[in-house]
């Protein structure tokens, strides 16, 4: 029996997820500096027409409950001077085969010189677009655009499982010598989503607080070793 296509639950448009620019900088004097490259699960701007009236990771109940802030809460226990930046790259997801064009508006993020780059995206790339290019190769180029040869990397697969894209994310992680974190099972679990909290079905299909915490917990299982490698360089 074929598995349900959970990705179809994501009816939140990939376009116009932000009102401002796609780069949200961190402190330049922070150590370690952690860059999250993501999509609406990482950060979605206010969009009242779908009942999303806040600006943080969809669909957490508060900013401090999204996976970025839960991850950083864990990191800062060991590294009080740590800080993070975010690049919201829903644009790249829909244009991954076009090279650096979607990345250039966020070049400031690589100038921040992150110690660690976390790649946590892919859900907005329609499977039918995979024929347009080598997705795994494009993911490697995306990561290295921001981190170059100096950063260490962590890659997750997708919240809503997709075999082809999840395999590409896994292969990209291998090429980058990155830590790989599986979260694709979470998108199959109703309790990990925000059902009943939002009228818009696409928003509600995003991870709720429990899902966000679980994503953060899984990242934090591997992130300390990644940070240690980065700071040892």
What are these regions (language model features)?
Residues 105-109, 139-144, 166:
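Generic structural signal for well-ordered alpha-helices
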Residues 58-66, 129-137, 159-164, 205-213:
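Soluble non-cytosolic domains of exported or imported proteins
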Residues 83-85, 152, 177-179:
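Conserved beta-strand segments of alpha/beta enzyme cores
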Residues 70-78, 141-145, 168-176, 222:
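Alpha-helical structural signal in soluble globular domains
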Residues 6-35, 43-130:
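Conserved SGNH/GDSL esterase-like catalytic core that processes O-acyl groups on lipids
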Residues 159-233:
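Catalytic His-Asp segment of secreted/periplasmic serine-dependent ester chemistry enzymes
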Residues 118-127, 143-171, 175:
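Active-site segments of SGNH/GDSL-like serine hydrolases
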Residues 37-38, 156:
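Short hydrophobic segments within beta-strands
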